[in-house]
Amino acid sequence: MVIATKHFGEIELEEDKILTFDHGIFGFEDCKRYTILYDGEDENSSVISWLQSLDEVSLALPIIQPSHVIDQYNPVIEDELLVSLGDIKEENIVVFLTLTVPSDLTKMTTNLKAPFIINTANKKGCQVVVEDPMFVVKYPVYEKFQNRAKKEDGEC
């Protein structure tokens, strides 16, 4: 199927790439169908990806896997919050965090408090709130990206 996207224009999307969020996401409860788009050639070459709504073209959120910005992100999430994901196993769960990218990139943050949890086996997703106060809504990530780039360039 062909879909319109906010940042990539019209693209061809295979049906098996559609994710369903039964309850939508916070602030966009009516938008239930999404896909993940990658800036790079594939998902392995992209640090930042996009959670693109299929129900509202203008809704595309930059997302990142926690391992790119924080060590040991393993919040406790109540089982009842994950019921909509169906049968979950560690090997079929992927976690993403939203990024906030202001014009001053040094102030870029990610939201550790409200991750997206996706069951890759059945393509179901949900967004949850982590109760632990250690996980904040605005976690600075610019310096983390800088350090990562230095490591990849072999400077560290």
Curated annotation (Swiss-Prot):
The uppermost taxa in this organism's lineage are: Bacteria, Bacillati, Bacillota, Clostridia, Lachnospirales
Record SUPFAM superfamilies: BH3618-like (SSF141457)
**Lineage: superkingdom:** Bacteria
**Protein name per its UniProtKB record:** Flagellar assembly factor FliW
Q: What does this protein do?
A: Acts as an anti-CsrA protein, binds CsrA and prevents it from repressing translation of its target genes, one of which is flagellin. Binds to flagellin and participates in the assembly of the flagellum.
Q: Which family does it belong to?
A: Belongs to the FliW family.
Q: Which GO terms describe its biological process?
A: bacterial-type flagellum assembly; regulation of translation
Any one Pfam family match given in the protein's UniProt record, by short name? FliW
Keywords carried by this UniProt record: Bacterial flagellum biogenesis, Chaperone, Cytoplasm, Translation regulation
Assembly, in brief, is:
Interacts with translational regulator CsrA and flagellin(s).
Please tell me one Gene Ontology term that the record gives under cellular component: cytoplasm
Reply yes or no: does the keyword Cytoplasm apply: yes
Q: Where is this protein primarily located? A: cytoplasm
Q: Where in the cell is it found?
A: Cytoplasm
